[in-house]
UniProtKB/Swiss-Prot annotation:
Protein's UniProt keywords contain rRNA-binding: yes
Keywords: Ribonucleoprotein, Ribosomal protein, RNA-binding, rRNA-binding
Signal peptide: none
Descriptive protein name: Small ribosomal subunit protein uS19
Protein's job: Protein S19 forms a complex with S13 that binds strongly to the 16S ribosomal RNA.
Disulfide bridge positions per record: none
GO molecular function: rRNA binding; structural constituent of ribosome
Gene: rpsS
Family: Belongs to the universal ribosomal protein uS19 family.
Organism: Vibrio campbellii (strain ATCC BAA-1116)
GO cellular component, one term: cytoplasm
GO biological process: one example: translation
One protein family per Pfam: Ribosomal_S19
Length: 92
């Protein structure tokens, strides 16, 4: 179930402070964060945010289409390597 509109978007306070500081100074360095649960807000447009996926920080460049989504949606946590091949089918 989606979040109620009257509550507004959730964003961690420490991340919000980092975003405001980066926008104010015009800094283009990636912002490191572990907060995958924070929602992308309009003030983040044009920033690169390095989102932690459990192993490393994945750089995510924020665009207009991403507003309203969560940061974790753009940093996949699992790698799919495909299913094991069938040995009988390989011989044919």
């Amino acid at each position: 179930m989606p979040r109620s509109l009257k509550k507004g978007p959730f964003i961690d306070l420490h991340l919000l402070k980092k975003v405001e500081k980066a926008v104010e100074s015009g800094d283009k360095k990636p912002l490191k964060t572990w907060s995958r649960r924070s929602m992308i807000i309009p003030s983040m447009i044009g920033l690169t945010i390095a989102v932690h996926n459990g192993r490393q920080h994945v750089p995510v460049f924020v665009t207009e289409e991403m507003i309203g989504h969560k940061l974790g949606e753009f940093a996949p946590t699992r790698t799919y390597r495909g299913h094991a091949a069938d040995k009988k089918a390989k011989k044919r």
